[in-house]
């Protein structure tokens, strides 16, 4: 703190992120520095917690929701401008106070590359990617196991679910010990790229969470055909045009089965996701949104 205070005229901007971290420093910065404060929230934590409470009904989650709602709006009022990775958070914040300076930015950027024309007849199985320190990913595997995979196996016993993600819980491990699951756990970037190339469909059956999902953007950048929920697709403009979206377990299983052997549609979805990445998720597109804040 002393270094910042003693050099307060040397900094034009201070970039804070994550509410539980930013709240420790923002008052000090405001009181002792002249820098413009930019806050990046990643997602609205209270939205995610509210959805978890609505689904699970846990009183501790309700307490956390109220705590983070107060915390996050305190930061929004104290920052000069706040960034979030999708328009959904901006809409939610503007409902509370339209005067708050908040922007949806591109949190993910890629170099433009040639479109991959994948031969889906040479692929197999379905892929889930998500770290299991994050509760919504554990819930997604639970929902898959209880309500989706049995419907798939009843129609096509050859389809396996490949599960990628660090720190799998005991529940996830036990589920994956049953037939039809292949638990990879943590994998290297190269191995993950191979899995994107080798599997037929990427699924993200998220029932709660908030904000744009990195796992979805990553799958799009790798030319995946994607099936997800409205929560999984949240914040991605025009998502229904290049991925399958449903919140119903029976329909989710049906979408997998319907798409699995439709190589033409798989290819079309793959091409469209890559076009969206090349058009929207570039350094130039990101800079155009924020450049005025750094003048």
Question: Residue spans of the language-model regions?
Answer:
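Acidic donor-binding loop of glycosyltransferase active sites
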Residues: 11-12, 80, 197-211, 222-224
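Conserved catalytic-core segment of nucleotide-activated headgroup transferases in glycan assembly
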Residues: 77-78, 83, 88, 95-99, ...
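Short hydrophobic beta-strand element within catalytic cores of glycosyltransferases
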Residues: 215-219, 225-228
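Membrane-proximal helix-turn-helix segments that form the acceptor-binding/catalytic region
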Residues: 45, 60-82
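Conserved acidic donor-binding segment of nucleotide-sugar-dependent glycosyltransferases
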Residues: 242-250, 258-263
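Short N-terminal targeting/anchoring amphipathic segment
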Residues: 5-24, 38
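A charged, aromatic-enriched C-terminal amphipathic alpha-helix characteristic of glycosyltransferases
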Residues: 264-294
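Active-site proximal beta-strand in glycosyltransferases
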Residues: 32-50
């Amino acid at each position: 703190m002393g270094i910042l205070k003693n050099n307060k005229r040397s900094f034009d901007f201070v970039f804070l992120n994550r509410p539980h971290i930013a709240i420790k420093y923002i008052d000090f910065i405001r009181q002792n520095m002249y820098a413009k404060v930019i806050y990046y929230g990643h997602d609205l934590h209270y939205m995610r917690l509210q959805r978890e409470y609505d689904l699970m009904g846990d009183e501790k989650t309700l307490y956390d929701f109220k705590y983070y709602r107060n915390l996050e709006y305190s930061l929004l009022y104290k920052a000069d401008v706040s960034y979030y990775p999708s328009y959904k958070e901006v809409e939610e914040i503007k409902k509370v106070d339209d005067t708050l300076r908040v922007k949806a930015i591109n949190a993910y950027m890629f170099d433009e590359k040639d479109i991959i024309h994948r031969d889906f007849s040479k692929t197999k199985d379905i892929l889930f990617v998500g770290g299991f320190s994050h509760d919504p990913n554990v819930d997604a595997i639970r929902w898959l196991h209880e309500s989706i995979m049995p419907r798939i196996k009843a129609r096509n016993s050859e389809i396996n679910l490949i599960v990628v993600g660090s720190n799998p819980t005991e529940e996830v491990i036990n589920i994956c010990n049953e037939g039809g699951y292949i638990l990879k756990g943590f994998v290297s970037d190269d191995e993950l790229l191979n899995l994107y190339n080798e599997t037929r469909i990427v699924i993200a059956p998220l029932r709660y969470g908030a904000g744009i999902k990195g796992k979805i953007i990553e799958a799009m950048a790798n030319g995946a055909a994607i099936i997800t929920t409205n929560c999984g697709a949240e914040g991605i403009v025009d998502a229904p045009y290049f991925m399958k979206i449903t919140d119903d377990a029976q329909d989710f299983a049906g979408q997998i089965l319907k798409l699995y052997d439709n190589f033409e549609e798989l290819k079309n979805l793959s091409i469209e996701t890559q076009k969206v990445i090349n058009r929207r998720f570039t350094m130039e597109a990101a800079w155009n949104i924020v450049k005025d804040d750094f003048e």
